[in-house]
Every structure is written in structure tokens, then in C-alpha cells.
């Protein structure tokens, strides 16, 4: 019994040290580059009857994950409305330049992006990176997770992650909607978008986005949201922008026609 207790204390101390050693990596929302150029801002809204997100009741069946939530369990995050669900804006929508940059080359950011596992959820639910940029996966929980990424243009991977562990991956091909899950906790889901230019953003808690540093030119701006319940009208917008010019573009999603 004495040996067993010592082993438990050693394991607990190891978990604490691992969590303390985990590097603090900024959650990135690139939104363009810090150079002179045009700026596009906007907001993504939802029009129509708002569906209600379902509670992740499966969490209650896992002792560790349940104790992460003292009150109400979290809800599915395949769609999230702004201001904690109290308004008509949409969070976690990818906004990006889809045409107009052909032939141009951009260096990936040196600073890594982060996809964290915390409270038995992926945070953020949507992360966007450039081709060649480092994406760090971190397990901030005191339980075992794994990262299982389903890809088409990049090599897939399925890696176990102990508490406090950080792994790095670099995607070498553009690819949208890479679904990332945890095999041990099936409700855990995130999406990774990989783009070949830095002019993209994921809408914030108020549904807003900013694309900055755009060279003068004509562009097509597209939006992407993961659920099949919604569709944008339209899905793209064309804009012509001059040096140091600012323009505003809003997008609207609505329930998908049956």
C-alpha cells in the first residue's frame, strides 16, 4: 500500500510539472499582414429561425471530463452565435481571399498557431493556418487525449497525447475543413483550415473579421462554415481595393433550403 501511494504521488507531481512546462502559445487570427495595403472589415450574420445547440450530454459519462464543469455542460459547437448565443452574428466562420492572389507568394508566419485540448474540448473550435506554418497541439487536461486528423491533401495522423504534451505539425498543401477529433472522447471536434495566403480570418465572438495589408487589386472573398444546416447568400463577394483603402463587406447565412 505504501509503494502504491508513493507511485500515485509521483504521477500527480509529474502531471503538474508537465502542465507547468507546457508553452504558452498565442491563439492566432492572422487576418492579413502588417504591411501597408487595403483593409476589408465586416460581420457575418444569421437570418432566420435560430436552431438551438444541443448539450454535450456524453460528457456526463466521463468522470474526469464531467468534473471540469461544475454547472451546466457545454453545448455542441458546430454552430455558435455571437455574444454567448444572444445575437444574430456567427462565430467561427472562415473568411478568406479565394481569388485574386494567383502567382503571388507569401512567407508563412514564424509564430505558431495553437489548438488546445482543455476541459475535454478543442479550443478554439476553428483554427486557420498558412501552408508551412507550425500548428501546435497541446493537451492541457489531466487525462489522456489523442489528435486524429482526417485529411485529403495532407498526410493524416492519429497521435496519443499525455497530459501537458505538445506536438507540432506543418501542413504543406492548402486544404479546408480538416476534421480533427479525439478518439477517446468522441464529442471533441475541431476544424483546421490551411490556406496558401495570409489573407484570412475566423470570425470573433461578435461575428466580426478583418483582412489587412491587401495589395491593390480585385479579389473574391469567400466564407465557410462547417455545418450543413446553414448556407451563405452569397458565398462569395467581389471587391476592388486600392492601396490603403478600407472597405466593408458583410455576409449573411440562412437555414439551408430543404
Segments the model singles out, each with a brief description of its role:
Residues 8-18:
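Hydrophobic h-region of N-terminal signal peptides that target proteins for export
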Amino acid at each position: 500500500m505504501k509503494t502504491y501511494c508513493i507511485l500515485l504521488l509521483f504521477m500527480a507531481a509529474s502531471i503538474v510539472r508537465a502542465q507547468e512546462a507546457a508553452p504558452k502559445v498565442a491563439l492566432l487570427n492572422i487576418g492579413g499582414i502588417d504591411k501597408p495595403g487595403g483593409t476589408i472589415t465586416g460581420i457575418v450574420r444569421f437570418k432566420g429561425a435560430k436552431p438551438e445547440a444541443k448539450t454535450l450530454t456524453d460528457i456526463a459519462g466521463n468522470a474526469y471530463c464531467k468534473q471540469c464543469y461544475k454547472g451546466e455542460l457545454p453545448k455542441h459547437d458546430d454552430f455558435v452565435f455571437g455574444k454567448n448565443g444572444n445575437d444574430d452574428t456567427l462565430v467561427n466562420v472562415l473568411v478568406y481571399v479565394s481569388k485574386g492572389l494567383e502567382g503571388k507568394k507569401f512567407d508563412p508566419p514564424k509564430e505558431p498557431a495553437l489548438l488546445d485540448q482543455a476541459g475535454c474540448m478543442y479550443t478554439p473550435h476553428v483554427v486557420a493556418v498558412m501552408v508551412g506554418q507550425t500548428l501546435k497541439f497541446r493537451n492541457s487536461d489531466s487525462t489522456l487525449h489523442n489528435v486524429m486528423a482526417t485529411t485529403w491533401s495532407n498526410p493524416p495522423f492519429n497521435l496519443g497525447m499525455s497530459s501537458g504534451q505538445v506536438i507540432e505539425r506543418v501542413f504543406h498543401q492548402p486544404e479546408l475543413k480538416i476534421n480533427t477529433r479525439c478518439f477517446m472522447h468522441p464529442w471533441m471536434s475541431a476544424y483546421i483550415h490551411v490556406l496558401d495566403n495570409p489573407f484570412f480570418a475566423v470570425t470573433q465572438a461578435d461575428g466580426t473579421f478583418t483582412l489587412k495589408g491587401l495589395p491593390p487589386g480585385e479579389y473574391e472573398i469567400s466564407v465557410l462554415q462547417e455545418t450543413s444546416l446553414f448556407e451563405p447568400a452569397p458565398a462569395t463577394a467581389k471587391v476592388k481595393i486600392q492601396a490603403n483603402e478600407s472597405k466593408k463587406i458583410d455576409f449573411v447565412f440562412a437555414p439551408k433550403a430543404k
